[in-house]
C-alpha cells in the first residue's frame, strides 16, 4: 500500500504511511510481550522541520522503540546484513532506510552520501554512531556519522536509549517483560556551525546521550554483541 501511495502522492507520503503502520504493529507487539516504553523529552522532538536523530545502540529493539514513540516518519542508516532478512528488508526499505556495508569503505561512503541527500530533501534520518550494538556501556561515537547532520545543515536530535538490551539481547533474542526508557534531548543546530565545534561534536553529543544513563553504562569495558 505504501508503494501505491508513493506513486499517487509522492515519496514523503509513502514513507509517512509506512512509518504510521509500522508504529501500530510495533506498539501492539510490545504491549503483548509486556514491554513498557517510557518517554521523556517528547517536547524536544521538532514538529515542523526535519532532523537527524543520534542515539546509542543497545539492541535490535531500539529501531522499533524509536518508530513507536517518535510520531514522525524516519529512516535509518542500517547495517547491510539486515537486507538478508526478507521481512525486515521490505519494511526498512518502505520507511526510507539506507543500508551500509561497514566492510566496504566505498559503499559506506556512498550510503552516507545517500543519507545526506535524503536529509537535504526533507527526510528525518537516524544513525547510531557507535557503529554496532553493545551490552550497555557506550562505545566511542564515530565522528564521521555526524556528517549526516553537518553536511545537510539539519539539527541533531540526541536520544538516550536505556534498558533495551536487558529485554532482547541478553535473552538470546527472546523478548522478556521489562521497561525501556527513551530520553529525547534538546536539538543541536548544525547549520553554520564553526569547524572547531564540528570537530568536537561527537564528544559533545555522546556526553549528552550518556547523561541519561547510569554511570557504569556511559563508558567503560563493554561486550560487542553485534557480529
Q: Could you tell me what each predicted segment is?
A:
Residues 43-44, 83, 104-106, 163, ...:
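Residue-level detector of flexible, active-site-proximal loop/helix-junction positions
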Residues 39, 53, 76, 182-184:
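Generic preference for hydrophobic
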Residues 38, 59, 84, 108-112, ...:
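Amphipathic coiled-coil/heptad-repeat helices and related helical stalk/stem segments
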Residues 109-227:
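Non-catalytic C-terminal accessory region of glycerolipid acyltransferases
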Residues 1-17, 37-47, 200-227:
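Membrane-interfacial terminal anchoring regions of lipid-handling membrane enzymes
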Residues 40, 77-79, 101-102, 128-129, ...:
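Thr-Gly-centered strand-to-loop micro-motif
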Residues 2-9, 15-20, 24, 31-33, ...:
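Catalytic core of membrane glycerolipid acyltransferases/transacylases, capturing the structured
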